[in-house]
């Protein structure tokens, strides 16, 4: 079974930390990744070279890899240039996630970046992190293998919107126009939500904050209990 079919109807757990986040430590994240796999996670979404290296030493599951890198001349920070792609290929991640919004990139535009990747690494699976239907259609046309809703609400154009509003309307809209497998990511907090999303025909769901960001989980509980 190929990897894309293998991850159908599965829970993908995002296990990431950067900057001053309290769990931003390769050893800590490797232990968390081990616990996630112990609990049944069959795919992980990971960022940053050292973290991915550490996790790969303790678990053997498919990895969706990305590198978060900020450049002064662009808002795009998820695997923004070919340099980050090269690093991820060297790490042998199974799928590379890239920002696939229509925003200005720090180096090549998205069209040329994808062309470069497909020339250098023709067998590399690519996942498009999108914020809008327009992003998703463009990414599909460029040849991305998977389309994700990761950046919904994270761009100026989609600020204030999310994947859950209006009974998952954005995900429903994607289903109408996207033929590639769709990955739902962003704002999913409960197993019930994940199940409802999968029942829409979405390929799989990614959950990060609700499982792996302990400070956010405690805040979520406290906000409800107030």
From Swiss-Prot:
Source organism per UniProt: Mycoplasma capricolum subsp. capricolum (strain California kid / ATCC 27343 / NCTC 10154)
Keyword field contains Isomerase: yes
Pathway: Amino-sugar metabolism; N-acetylneuraminate degradation; D-fructose 6-phosphate from N-acetylneuraminate: step 3/5
Family according to the record: Belongs to the NanE family.
Keywords from the named record: Carbohydrate metabolism, Isomerase
One cellular component (GO) term of this entry: cytosol
Pfam families: NanE
Catalytic activity: an N-acyl-D-glucosamine 6-phosphate = an N-acyl-D-mannosamine 6-phosphate
Superkingdom to which the source organism belongs: Bacteria
GO MF annotations in UniProt: N-acylglucosamine-6-phosphate 2-epimerase activity
Function of the protein: Converts N-acetylmannosamine-6-phosphate (ManNAc-6-P) to N-acetylglucosamine-6-phosphate (GlcNAc-6-P).
HAMAP family linked to this entry: ManNAc6P_epimer
Protein's recorded name: Putative N-acetylmannosamine-6-phosphate 2-epimerase
Nucleotidyltransferase keyword on record: no
One BP annotation, GO: N-acetylneuraminate catabolic process
EC annotation from Swiss-Prot or TrEMBL: 5.1.3.9
